[in-house]
């Protein structure tokens, strides 16, 4: 076990260096004076894009080699550090003494360690100044993150083996990068693979250990992204702790929900990129709420988040589109303003170009598309993706073909002979038309037909979405909270009109719409709509959105509390709320169990 603990620590250190420390040092002038949220979003998106672009570009020129990547990354890092004049003079002075024989190796290394210690102390002092007055809040967030990492790492430490069959495929693709071959199985978003390849090259961490532990560690980035989004859009900054606590403790009852949660244990592209879904939405909202013109920092981070999502996995980009649309629909007037529309379109185009250019060039050079990218054709043809449910839905509703039901060819011919001929059907249809025309049945008004269609669709979404995923009892509670959220949204709109004489950009409406829209996407096959994303893949973000929607009443209470003298105790109350959720889930027997691990092979 000690070996695996050491490997876990190595993966964690490599991840922190590559994802956060390297860009923080190299781009420190740009990040100087920026908020912690900006720094987090910048580092977690720009680092992925730079690594992806560098590795794939070297591969396109057939010069991808670990030694080149090693010298480029460490060379840029060291050169950036030595840009500081005082540090450069000190290091050069120490080196001159070392080579002149005036300083021994031990003394040189001791001086280097002292300098590193000084830099670390300075960093933590600055960080302490940043979080001054909010230590309890960040303490709660840190505990939740550590809890999540421990929970999602449990399976890997128990089995020391990949928990999902697809991980062996991704292992092979990363090994292809080690051999200098990009897109070894065809053109496919490879940002995650390039990231793990770089960890292997820069730190000597095996691909196996990276794939085994990176996904669980990367959960921290997902939770921080969720934290940043809901801290921005909710009225109180303390409500988000309740959302995260509920997400990490409450059990799920449907196999699709369990599958969605279990995927966070695995290092696979979609889950690696889920954090960009929330960052895209965060910076689009900030962009729409701004008063300035031009291409600002908010739009830049929206662009990098969009580009990172495309570079990691296309499903994440599709989810980001629907989540952004849920909020943007309530700010259409801001989108189509002259000062916003042009730069927003430019940012989207740049994001798409940055992320897809290596893939487009690889495809143009003759590398074929990877097979899973045919999902678009599957939708057009009405056939299933690997995890799709379209044909299963047809089977359950009586629309399946004889091939789907396994009926033999002989039985098929017997059934065919018993069916009426086409001429008989035409005759019967003509008779029915004549009867209808002779009886003069009044036509149903268009409004009523539309209303009936909407009601029928809502019932199907409830039946094949809420009920199927959460059961009758929980689905009932979700419906009640959705109604409460809608009422609170209307109340806030009325207050905004009365006080500000305008309709404000409604965040509550966006949360409620997003939770329903993702449920609609899940139930799409049952409504006769194409299954754009495999239903089980939607369950994780949907769970977060539903919990956020249910937290809207608590957010209002926190907001009102902060307007009173008792508002000083809001952090302590949020801590009590987190503890109450943990205790309550255990007391009522709804605390989550351990997630399943699919052992296709055992180490």
Model region roles, listed by residue range:
Residues 1-131:
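Membrane-embedded, hydrophobic transmembrane alpha-helices
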Residues 6-22, 271-277, 433-499, 542-543, ...:
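Alpha-helical transmembrane segments at the extracellular/periplasmic loop-to-helix junctions
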Residues 60-69, 157-167, 182, 204, ...:
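Membrane-helix boundary/interfacial segments in multi-pass membrane proteins
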Residues 126-135, 238-239, 291-296, 334-345, ...:
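Membrane-interface helix-loop-helix junctions at transmembrane boundaries of multi-pass membrane enzymes
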Residues 127-275, 541, 598-602:
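Active-site lumenal/periplasmic loops and adjacent helix-entry segments of GT-C-fold
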Residues 298-314:
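Membrane-interface alpha helices of multi-pass inner-membrane proteins
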Residues 319-353:
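Perimembrane helix-loop-helix junctions
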Residues 344-355, 556-593:
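Signature aromatic-anchored transmembrane alpha helix within multi-pass, membrane-resident enzymes
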């Amino acid at each position: 076990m000690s070996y695996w603990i050491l490997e876990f620590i190595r993966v964690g250190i490599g991840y922190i260096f590559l994802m956060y420390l390297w860009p923080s040092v190299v781009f420190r002038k740009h990040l100087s004076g920026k908020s912690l949220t900006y720094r987090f979003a910048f580092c977690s998106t720009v680092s992925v894009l730079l690594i992806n672009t560098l590795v794939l570009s070297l591969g396109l020129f057939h010069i991808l080699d670990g030694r080149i990547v090693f010298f480029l990354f460490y060379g840029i890092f060291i050169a950036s550090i030595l840009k500081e004049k005082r540090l450069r003079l000190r290091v050069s002075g120490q080196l001159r003494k070392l080579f002149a024989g005036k300083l021994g190796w031990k003394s040189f290394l001791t001086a280097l360690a002292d300098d590193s210690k000084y830099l670390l102390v300075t960093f933590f002092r600055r960080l302490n100044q940043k979080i001054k007055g909010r230590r309890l809040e960040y303490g709660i967030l840190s505990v939740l993150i550590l809890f999540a990492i421990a929970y999602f790492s449990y399976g890997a430490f128990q089995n020391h083996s990949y928990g999902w069959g697809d991980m062996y495929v991704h292992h092979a693709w990363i090994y292809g990068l080690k051999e200098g071959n990009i897109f070894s199985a065809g053109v496919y978003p490879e940002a995650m693979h390039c990231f793990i390849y770089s960890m292997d090259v820069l730190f000597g961490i095996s691909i196996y250990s990276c794939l085994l532990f990176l996904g669980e560690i990367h959960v921290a980035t997902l939770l921080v992204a969720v934290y940043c989004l809901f801290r921005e859009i909710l009225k109180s900054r303390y409500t988000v702790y309740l959302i995260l606590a509920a997400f990490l403790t409450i059990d799920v009852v449907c196999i699709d929900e369990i599958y969605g949660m279990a995927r966070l244990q695995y290092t696979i592209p979609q889950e690696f990129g889920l954090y960009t879904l929330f960052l895209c939405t965060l910076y689009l909202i900030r962009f729409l709420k701004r008063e300035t013109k031009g291409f600002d920092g908010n739009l830049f981070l929206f662009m990098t988040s969009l580009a990172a999502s495309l570079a990691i996995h296309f499903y994440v980009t599709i989810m980001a589109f629907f989540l952004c649309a849920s909020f943007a629909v309530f700010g259409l007037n801001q989108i189509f303003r002259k000062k916003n529309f042009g730069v927003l379109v430019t940012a989207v185009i740049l994001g798409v170009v940055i992320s897809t250019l290596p893939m487009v060039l690889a495809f143009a050079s003759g590398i074929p598309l990877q097979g899973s990218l045919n999902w678009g054709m599957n939708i057009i043809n009405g056939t299933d993706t690997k995890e799709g449910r379209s044909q299963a839905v047809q089977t359950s509703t009586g629309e399946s073909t004889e091939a789907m039901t396994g009926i033999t060819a002989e039985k098929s011919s017997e059934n065919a002979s018993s069916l009426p001929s086409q001429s008989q059907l035409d005759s019967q249809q003509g008779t029915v038309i004549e009867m209808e025309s002779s009886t003069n049945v009044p036509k149903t008004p268009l409004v009523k037909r539309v209303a009936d269609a909407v009601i029928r669709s809502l019932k199907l979404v409830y039946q094949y979405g809420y009920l199927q995923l959460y059961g009758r009892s929980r689905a009932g509670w979700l419906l009640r909270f959705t109604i409460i959220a809608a009422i609170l949204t209307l109340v806030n709109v009325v207050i905004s009109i009365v006080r500000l004489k305008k309709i404000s950009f409604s965040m509550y409406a966006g949360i409620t719409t997003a939770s329903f829209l993702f449920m609609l996407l899940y139930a799409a096959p049952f409504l006769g709509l194409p299954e754009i994303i495999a239903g089980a893949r939607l369950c994780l973000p949907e769970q977060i959105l539903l919990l956020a929607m249910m937290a809207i009443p608590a957010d209002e209470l926190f907001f009102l509390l902060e307007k009173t003298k008792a508002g000083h105790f809001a952090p302590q109350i949020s801590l009590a709320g987190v503890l109450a959720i943990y205790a309550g889930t255990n007391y009522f027997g709804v605390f989550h169990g351990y997630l399943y691990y699919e052992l296709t092979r055992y180490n």
